[in-house]
Amino acid sequence: MTANRALAAPVSTGTGAYRSGAAWATGRGAVAGALAMVCVGGSVAVTGTLAKAPVYTAEGLRYAAACLLLLAFARVCGRPVRLPRAAEWLWLSGIAATGLVVFNVALADGARDAEPAVFGVAVASVPALLAVAGPLLERSRPAPRTVLAAVVLTCGAALVQGLGRCNAAGYGWAAVVFGCEAAFTLLAVPVLGRHGAVGVSVHTTWIAAVVFAVLGAVREGPAAVARLSAADWLATGYLAVGVTAVAFVRWYTCVGRLGAGRAGLLTGIAPIAATLTGVLLSGPAPRPMVWAGIAVVIAGLALGIRNGEGPSTL
C-alpha cells in the first residue's frame, strides 16, 4: 500500500483515483464485515434455544449443512475451491480446531463457570490483539490509530455487555474463548490469498463437521440426532445459513479487503446487534450504560475504519 501511494503521488489524478479506489474497497469490506457481525450478534437469542439440546451433534449438523451450502454457492458462482497444499492444511485445520471446535466447546462447557457476559467481554477484547498481530502477519507495522480504536471499542463493548460473574475456571474458559476468536481471523491471513473467502469457509466447515460428528458420537451417543426437537432443527438451520455460510464468507471477505487489524474493529457491532435484537424480541429496553457503550463503540469504529492511516510495510 505504501509503495502504491508513492507511485501515485507525482500525478494528482492518479492519487485521486487511488484514494477513490481505496475508499471504495474499504467501504465494501466494512459493509461485508458489518453484515457478518449483525448475523452473529442477532443469533444470540437463537443459540439459547439449543441450551438443552445435544450441542455437539447439533454443531456437527450445522457445519455439515453450511459446507454443502457453500459448495453449492461456489459452483453456481464459478468460485474455485482448491485443494490445500502442504502447510495450508495446518492453517485451515487450525482455524477449524480453534475458531470453530474449541471455541464452541469452551462456550458450552464454560457456561457452568461463567455468565455469558464474561465470554462477551473476552470476544470484545480480541480487536486489540488483531490490531497488533494482524498487520504483523501481513508483514506490515500496526497502525497506531487502529490500535487506539480497538481499545476504545473494547471499552464500549464491555459497557454494552456488562462484566458478568465467574469463578477461577470461568476465567480460564474466557481466555480460551479469547484465543480461539483471535485465531479464527489470524490463521486465515496466510491462506486467504489463494483460497479466498469461500474456499477458506468450505474447508474449515467440513473439517469442523467431521470433528463435531466424532465428539457427538462419543459424548452424546450415535442416536443423539433423534433427540433434537423441531425448535432445535430450526435453530441449527438458522445457524448453518446465517451465522456460518453467510457470515463466514462476509467476514473473510472483509479481512481480505481491510486486513485483519481494521476488520477486527467490526466485531464491536456484534454486541450491539445482540442488544437491539433482544429489544425487538420484546426484551427490556437498554439501560443508559448500554447506550453509552453503543456510543463508544460507534466512536471507535469511526476512528479506526475510515480510510486514511493504514499499516506501513515492514
Where are these regions (language model features)?
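Membrane-interface helix-cap regions at the ends of transmembrane helices
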Residues: 42-48, 53, 66-84, 105, ...
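Glycine-/small-residue-enriched transmembrane alpha-helix faces in small-molecule transporters
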Residues: 1-61, 66, 105, 109, ...
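Specific transmembrane alpha-helical segments of multi-pass solute transporters/efflux pumps
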Residues: 39-44, 71-123, 157-160, 240-258
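Specific alpha-helical transmembrane segments that line the substrate/conduction pathway
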Residues: 57-68, 99-100, 104-141, 146, ...
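Hydrophobic transmembrane alpha-helices of multi-pass small-molecule transport proteins
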Residues: 38, 70, 93, 125, ...
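C-terminal-most transmembrane helix of multi-pass membrane proteins
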Residues: 2-19, 63, 220, 232-234, ...
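Cytoplasmic-side transmembrane-helix entry/capping segments in multi-pass membrane proteins
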Residues: 30-33, 85-95, 141-153, 171-175, ...
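Helix-helix packing/entry segments at the starts of transmembrane helices
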Residues: 33, 37, 61, 118-126, ...
